[in-house]
Every structure is written in structure tokens, then in C-alpha cells.
Amino acid sequence: MLKRFTRYVTQSVAGMIGISVYVLADTFFISVYSGADGLAVLNLILPVYGLIYAIGAMIGIGSATRYAISRAKGKNTEHYFVQSVTWSILAAVPFMLIGIFIPDKALALLGADAGLIGLGRNYVRIILIATPFFMSNYTFTAFARNDGAPSIAMIGSISGSIFNIIFDYIFMFPVGLGFSGAGLATAICPIVTMSVCTIHYRSSRNHVGFHWKKPSFRHLISCCQLGVSAFVGELSSGVIAIVFNFLILGIAGNMGVAAYGVVANLSIVAFAIFNGLAQGAQPLISESYGKGQPTQVRKLLKWSLLVCLAVEALIQLIIWTSTDTLISIFNSENNVQLLNYAHTGLRLYFLGFIVAGINIVLVAYFSAVDELKIAIVGSFLRGIVAIVICAVILAKLFGLDGIWISLLTAETVTFLTILFLAYKDRNRIE
């Protein structure tokens, strides 16, 4: 089982890092193309990515988790995949309409001024129109992973990311599409990933059914309950971005937002690692839980937490020894003010990952074993409630430094709450 755990987690983490490169590649090339203004625009758009990914993850990962549990119990799962794709497409329609008709208003709502709206209009239009691909991508990768093909899911994600990196450059510079080129490359990315995942679905090893069944709202709710932790895990970056953007705009203006763009984009990689760890362990935990193997379930949780602690230590080492080097990747203009803001921000903000990784693993664990109350409370607390309250209060008390340290404060509150709920319900959980 340890060998299988290692394979699932390693490949899931690699795949999630691949997905995070969607945004990182855009950030790098856009910083080269338009400097601090480009970083500010992209950071204002991050909440849009967060919401799209969150809904896609809730439907796709929730459905795949329900598929794993139901299949382990011998239930009929022939329609789960098609239902998941159908609901993903339906959920994408409002985003597409906004992208087609009112992208300017969407950017203004996120805090962009007239100059930033002009710069980012076509980019956000392309991203919103491509929402069905972003959302369905989670279904394709999660079902492949939960159907015993984590390597295919990983290869698919990495293939999409490589495409994104190469064509970001080609579309933006040689072709001359600029900001729009970055959006186009990112929009095609999930199509590449899904195409690779189709290799598994067409193979003899596939157990996923493709039977059509009228979309069931009851089935959707059943699956989404198991996908809430994934939803909040993806949404949290968007919520944090919205709150931080407005708070930082009032304290440090556009340059402060650009600095947060550097911090936020690097944090995407850290979140991807921990989400990959949680999603890699989840199908094994769900399978063991469905088969009634509590000893195996506890062993998988222990391994997940040990890996989490090791990764947290490595992340802190990298951040504290390579702060300015990491910032320089996105600071093509060598802006001193941007460097100063981001230097402090990166070190203080990333202290939050000492606890965040553990919370992500615990929330995914409780979701995998159908302990929805703890999973939902933990998810919403760390992703929305605690971080918003802490950011607002600490910003008033300590200014910009208070905003940076709010992640650590919120994650600590969440961790203590999860421990309390788990202890309170320990007899039923065991």
C-alpha cells in the first residue's frame, strides 16, 4: 500500500503543479510584456480563476469521490462521469455570457481602473468563454485518477502546461497577440489535458461508464457534498485575492497589488502541492473506507500528514533562502518598490503554509470518509470566514504586514477548530 500511496501522491502533486503553471506561465510572460500593470491586471483576475476552478473541482472531484466509494461498495456507477461533465458545462454558461457581453464590468467589479480594463479586457473575455473546458478538465483528471490511472492524469496535466508555456510565448510575441495570446494559450490548455486523459477512457483498463442519464439535481448534491472541500480549497485563493486586493489598494495602491500578485502566484504552487497530496491520497482513503478497512484508513492519514510536514519544511527553506530570486522572476523592470513590498510579503504570507498544508489534508481526509460536517466547517473556515475576518482586523491593526500575516492566523484558527470537532465526535468517527 505504501508503494501505491507514493505513486498516487507523487503523480497527483505533479499534475496539480502542472495545472498551477496555467497561471504562472501567464504571469511570467505578462510581466515581461507589460510590467507592473500587467501583474496588477492578472492579480485582479485571479479570483475569476479561483471561482471557475472551485466549481469545476466541486463537481468533478466530488463526483469522482462518490464514484470511488460507490464502486468499492459494488454499486452502479455507469452514469457518474457523464453527469459530472453535463453539470460542469451547465455551470459554465453564466461565465461564458459574462465573457461575451460584459467583460469590462466584470473587471471593474474586481477593482480595475480604466487603464487596467483596457489592458485586460480581451484576456478575461477569452478565459470566461473557455470556462466549460476548465471545469470539465477536473472531471476528466479526477475520474482517471480514481479509476486507477493517476499517471495518465499527471501526464495530461503536465502536457497541457507544457503547451501553455510554449504557446504563451508564441502567441504573445512572434504572433503578436499580446495579452490576448496569453489568454488563448491558457484556454487551449485543458483541451490538451482532456485529450490525454481520453487515452485511459478508451483503454481496456477503463471502468468508467459513459451511459447517458437525465441530469439529476439530487445526484449533483450528493456528489458536491463530497466536493465541498475541493471547492473551498480552490475558491480560497480567489476569495483571499479579492479581499487582499481591496485592502492592499487602500494601503499601497497598484504597486502593492502588483507585489501581492507575485506572492499570490507563488502561493498557487504551494497550494497545488498540498491539494495534489490531498487529492492523491483521497481515492485510496475512500476505497479503504468503502471496503470497511479502518486500520488502512488511519495509516493513509498518517502517511499523508508526514509527507505534508516534510513539504512544509522544504517550502519554508526555499522561501527564506531565495526570497529575492523568486521575486526577480516576475520583476522584469527591477522595480525597487515592488521588490521591497514583495520581499516582506512573501516571507510573512508563506508562514501560513506551516498550518495550511495540514488543514488541506485533514479536510480532504474527512471528506473522503464521508464526515461531511467537519470537512465543510473546516473548508469554509479556512477558505472564506477566518481569512476574511483576520485580514480585515489585522490590516487595521498592523497595516500591510497585518494582511501578510493573516493567512497564518486564519489557518491556526481553522486547525484548532478541526481538532475540537474531531475530538468531540471521536467515538462516532472511530
Which positions does each model-derived feature cover?
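Transmembrane helix-bundle signature of multi-pass secondary active exporters and lipid flippases
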Residues: 12-61, 65, 130-134, 221-287, ...
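Membrane-helix interface/capping residues of multi-pass secondary transporters
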Residues: 27, 36-39, 150, 179, ...
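Short runs within selected transmembrane alpha-helices of multi-pass transporters and secretion channels
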Residues: 60, 126-145, 153-164, 182-197, ...
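Helix-loop interface residues and adjacent transmembrane-helix termini in multi-pass membrane transporters
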Residues: 24, 33-36, 70, 146-147, ...
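Small-residue-rich hydrophobic transmembrane alpha-helices
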Residues: 39-97, 134-146, 150-152, 259-317, ...
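Short alpha-helical transmembrane segments in multi-pass integral membrane proteins
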Residues: 1-13, 67-130, 177-228, 285-352, ...
